[in-house]
């Protein structure tokens, strides 16, 4: 294991000096672009995105930065991915199917846009000589365990959606590549991530609905679904903290705020974000404990491991959601794709 425990060089700000960001035009990816290019010691950032969920406007502020290269291509184009990865030490892998509920009618989507993508990333990393992969997994890998607060070594892991299954398969693939090919992978099981440029999620959906019709809001499920919501800046801080401090060939971290909020409470926050009187809004619930097949209605995550490295969220769930929805409400493209 000659290289697996060796970190790539970091800047004085703790960032990788170069990175290929797969999904870099998306919600989280574009914030990574902002963060890395704000660091003068970062020498190169390459964005790789097929724009299925991302948008070029997310990174347009950096169009004149010569350190940035943008590749519009599909991750399944392995030769292009290998070419783009070559010369980088770090890959930030964020690409996946953005529509979790879509698998109910298209069960193959999470294999094609999840498991297969991560296999392509693993191969590109192996062939190109990249040393570190930072992988966006998800809390769904734990399955439906109700109020039990999951730590990273919880088991057995029994996903209840193909999306979560693809994330777990991705962790397994990257772990095996780390040990077999002297790589280093850090996987992150995020709570629900929110913030400006969000392209999906309950807050995004509520804001779009209320902008279209401020008198009515359709809510999936019974509104009692309860989860942790993490602001995107806190996600970036967690990933970069773990990248700087974790030395294992494969490591995994939950990232959550430690508090929880229900969908019904989010509906009220959406009205607050838009300065709408909730008494004038008709809330229509679809019923049932789950928003869709494969949804996990209650998610509890322990984030003690990432906190032990010095990370703390700057916002709790309600503040993260309110700030995110206020930002989304001012974005001209919120009401369109």
Give the label of every model feature segment.
Residues 169, 173, 177, 206, ...:
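Hydrophobic alpha-helix immediately C-terminal to the catalytic Tyr-X-X-X-Lys motif of short-chain
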